[in-house]
Curated annotation (Swiss-Prot):
Signal peptide as annotated in the record: 1-16
Gene Ontology cellular-component terms listed: extracellular region
Highest taxon of source: Eukaryota
Name recorded for this polypeptide: Fatty-acid and retinol-binding protein 1
Gene: far-1
Annotated compartments: Secreted
Mod. after translation: Not glycosylated.
Family to which this protein belongs: Belongs to the fatty-acid and retinol-binding protein (FARBP) family.
Source organism of this protein record: Brugia pahangi (Filarial nematode worm)
Keyword terms: Coiled coil, Lipid-binding, Retinol-binding, Secreted, Signal, Vitamin A
Pfam families per the UniProt record, alphabetical: Gp-FAR-1
A GO term for molecular function: retinal binding
Length: 178
């Protein structure tokens, strides 16, 4: 169970950097698990900023890579672009600080999370999400204890999630349902 929770936390953190969302959709009791930098980014969004993010998210399949998406964002709002780049650089610095095994693992999670996005803007496929989580859990379990500890230290929000009993129950239930 401990391993599943760590992986879901990493997936959640990654998804926050891959798929724009509104903090209003997150229950209050879970907001404490979101890194402060991410909370601040979303807290400062205007109605117009949110609309720009929704528009670009619906066109994500048209962007060759993250840089192309950021350029499209810059064309829409220089302020929003600067804030997004600042958040991206924060996350990138954390990932770049990791040793090779941990970095490869996080890069794989990001790639997996990006592959879950629907090209046509429809709802995410729950079964694909479950399978992705199972795949990531298997990869996580194969990591050395040193690498697992490094991930916990680098991403402290994970440590908070690990201790939350309600999240543990929800994660277990979600992954077991067919």
């Amino acid at each position: 169970m401990y391993h599943r929770l760590i992986l879901l936390a990493l997936v959640g953190t990654t998804m926050a950097n891959v798929i724009p969302f509104s903090m209003n959709n997150i229950p209050e009791e879970y907001k404490e698990f979101i890194p402060e930098e991410v909370r601040n980014f979303y807290k400062d969004l205007t109605v117009e900023d949110k609309e720009i993010l929704r528009e670009l998210a619906s066109k994500h399949a048209t962007f060759a890579n993250e840089d192309a998406a950021l350029e499209a964002l810059k064309d829409k709002s220089d302020k929003l672009y600067k804030n997004a780049v600042e958040l991206r650089n924060f996350v990138k610095a954390k990932i770049d600080s990791l040793k090779p095994d941990a970095k490869i693992f996080v890069d794989e999670i990001i790639a997996k999370a990006r592959s879950l996005r629907s090209d046509d803007g429809h709802k995410l496929d729950t079964e694909k999400i479950k399978q992705a989580a199972r795949d990531i859990i298997a990869k996580y379990q194969a990591l050395s204890e040193e690498t697992k500890e490094e991930l916990k230290v680098t991403f402290p929000a994970i440590a908070k999630i690990i201790g939350n009993e309600k999240l543990k129950r929800n994660a277990s239930t979600f992954l077991q349902k067919n």
